[in-house]
Amino acid sequence: MKKILVVEDEESLRLFYEEELKAEGYDILTARNGREAIRQLETGKPDLIILDIVMPVMDGMETLGRIVGQERKIPVILNTSYSGYRQDFMSWAADAYVTKSHDLTELKRKIRELLEKGKGQ
């Protein structure tokens, strides 16, 4: 079973993503901010990371930089309400960029695509 780390500070969205992705057959880890996400990487390696950008403690861009420096083989999907970050240089380090929606069709498609692609191979 593929393991996905969902990094999202809004509890209702984090629980929604967890429920929806578990129904798709994924094992889900969650983190409320970048610092928790980095801790999760130290204890268990997910197959993919879904990363919010605007979060307290450690934002998504700083978290992305640390992930890229430590675990480049793990694909990262930036998932945000703010489309302006798409042009941010640091966002180019992510494998995909998906605008948040309660319709997870696009997010699920990107997850399947990246997991099937087998990053780093």
Predicted regions and their residues:
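Conserved acidic carboxylate
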Residues: 8
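Alpha4 helix (beta4-alpha4-beta5 surface) of REC/receiver domains from two-component response regulators
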Residues: 62, 83-109
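Hydrophobic/aromatic residues positioned on beta-strands within the core alpha/beta folds
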Residues: 77-79
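Acidic catalytic/metal-coordinating carboxylates
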Residues: 33-36, 59-62
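C-terminal output helix
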Residues: 18, 102-115, 119
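Receiver (REC) domain active-site loop signature in two-component systems and cognate sites
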Residues: 55
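Active-site residues of response regulator receiver
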Residues: 52
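Two-component/phosphorelay signaling modules centered on CheY-like receiver
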Residues: 11-29
